[in-house]
Amino acid sequence: MNFENLLIELGTEELPPKSLRKLAESFLANFTEELSKADLAFSSAVWYAAPRRLAINVTELALAQADKVVEKRGPAVSSAFDAEGKPTKAAEGWARGNGITVEQAERLVTDKGEWLVHNAKVEGVETKSLIAAMAQRALDKLPIPKPMRWGNNKTQFIRPVHTATMLLGSELIEGELLGIKSARTVRGHRFMGLKQFELAHADHYLADLKEKGKVIADYESRKALIKADAEKAAAKIGGTADIEDSLLEEVASLVEWPVVLTASFEEKFLAVPSEALVYTMKGDQKYFPVFDDAGKLLPNFIFVTNIESKDPAQIISGNEKVVRPRLADAEFFFNTDKKHTLESRLPSLETVLFQQQLGTLKDKVNRISALAAFIAEQTGANAVDAARAGLLSKTDLMTNMVMEFTDTQGTMGMHYARLDGETEAVAVAMEEQYKPKFSGDTVPSAGVSCAVALADKLDTLVGIFGIGQAPKGAADPFALRRAAIGVLRIIVENKLPLDLVDLIAKAQALHGTNLSNANASDEVLEFLMARFRAWYQDKGIGVDVILAVLARRPTRPADFDSRINAVSHFRSLEASSALAAANKRVSNILAKVEGALPTTINASLLTEAAEQALAAKLNELQPLLAPLFANADYQQALTLLAGLRESVDQFFEDVMVMADDEALKNNRLALLNNLREQFLHVADISLLQ
């Protein structure tokens, strides 16, 4: 057998749950990179991870590097021998260094001459002698922001390390990892099974840990088990568990032997908005809330414990006692907050600074209110509701509930607005103003919500750029990139008839004399246009398509999107590459013209059949294209323009544009200028690759 399975395990103290997957994936990626660098073949590799261990398993790993022949070139033959044909000192020194005589050297003939060469056979190194060093290098490259030392050890790692195991098949690999000598000892569960045991073979790792150590080392298996058992537990009480993947990942990273249990809380707490209860259950306690078929929160929750108890009722009771005070806090905050309207909290916003040069939160909501009304007027939304929602948009930040449970901002604003008797549009806008919160999140769809969300983001963008604090490098303390993408997505996905230039100008005017950067509006526009490029690239749109549209500088995002879609479709047409090349040729010709470009086409000067045909085709298309351009139906316009391919090809085949006759030349330049202008109504397709 010339291959074996490899197991490497690092036994540690409890690893940070939110970092566990990343650590394990990085460990595997780093180690397989080491294998590739060492030219060690293997079939597959996987990672395992539990709260107190990181492990990797490599299947069918070659037991040694393959032997290889290394060409060692010596001096040129012309300088390797003297006039009498005897080896020179240079040749003899080279041969001696390679363990051969000059006579044993081979000859290599190249186009630059003939050389002495020695094809040396290099035997592959045994894998077992390489593993420890490769594993250590893989660990050294793990993404650990704050490593720690322990005991008298000088070694640093994310948590103290207690065991290291490296097995190639049944053979123990000698060496150290993070200062710990490799041994067969593997630690089991803290409270169940064997505290530690000897691992005989790499292939026994998962089974032995599960049977002897009461540890499910396979992260994905553990995660799947928790999900399945939680779903079953919820179904038993007539509900559906809210199993968010990020929480499921965290819970799977906290337990080695997951046991799913169901608990309950008093129904009186259901009078509190469910979002606050869910926040404390998921965020603080790592519980899975349960909802009925109508989406209403049930007075139950599902939790995962790390031990099989003889008395699970005691564990359930303990968790119920832990969560009760948190729910009682939420109830108290809610009842206290209801005593004051959101409007009554407006003066308190004056005590909170938004930004030193941009004023307080009260200043900000005043600007948001005015800008939201301006946007609503342009989109056909209720401007009165938009202004009201903008004014109240940050008042829930002053409530006890949001101060305690920060992730409920906006959501609690919606509930309090309803209790205050605000319109439903205002209430919904209170929650949706922060959308989209992350990549993949939905955007607000209601008109008032869109107006407030846009106003909030644009106020921040223009304000921060206006005081000269634009993002630099990776640093973006005000999350301006996310705000910019949010602005674009809201406008594009709702097809809103808004122009960025107008929005930026209005936002800048509302800041008054606060802004010190005279170029703020231009910089914000450039920033937004750059986000367009990043956003479309993430969606898989070709860079050349994006650049073709950017060349026209459309500042209406919905219009920009229509152009992107049209050019993307145009690229799929058979005629696109030829027309792109022709447009590039036209651009190059026109760029060389000094002074103003001729624009008038004189039909009597169209002497060649090919130019007559092209002019006729353009005349035929223009009345059809005009309404398409006016209605932003760019896809249909480019589809019609694709029909020009044969006429354009024939024109360049038969017609000399730069004719000696000045009148003919200018007429042909005017024809080409007209041709290019039709395409430029959509994009500069000469930039398509």
Curated annotation (Swiss-Prot):
Primary enzyme class: ligase
What keywords are annotated for this sequence in UniProt?
Aminoacyl-tRNA synthetase, ATP-binding, Cytoplasm, Ligase, Nucleotide-binding, Protein biosynthesis
Q: What is its EC number?
A: 6.1.1.14
Q: Name one GO cellular component term.
A: cytosol
Recorded GO MF terms? arginine-tRNA ligase activity; ATP binding; glycine-tRNA ligase activity
Compartments, record wording: Cytoplasm
What main location does UniProt list? Answer: cytoplasm
Q: What GO terms in the biological process aspect are recorded for it?
A: arginyl-tRNA aminoacylation; glycyl-tRNA aminoacylation
Q: Which reaction does it catalyse?
A: tRNA(Gly) + glycine + ATP = glycyl-tRNA(Gly) + AMP + diphosphate
Checking SMART domains in the record gives: DALR_1 (SM00836)
Assembly and interaction partners:
Tetramer of two alpha and two beta subunits.
Family to which the UniProt record says this protein belongs: Belongs to the class-II aminoacyl-tRNA synthetase family.
Specify the protein name: Glycine--tRNA ligase beta subunit
Source species: Shewanella baltica (strain OS223)
> Which gene codes for it?
glyS
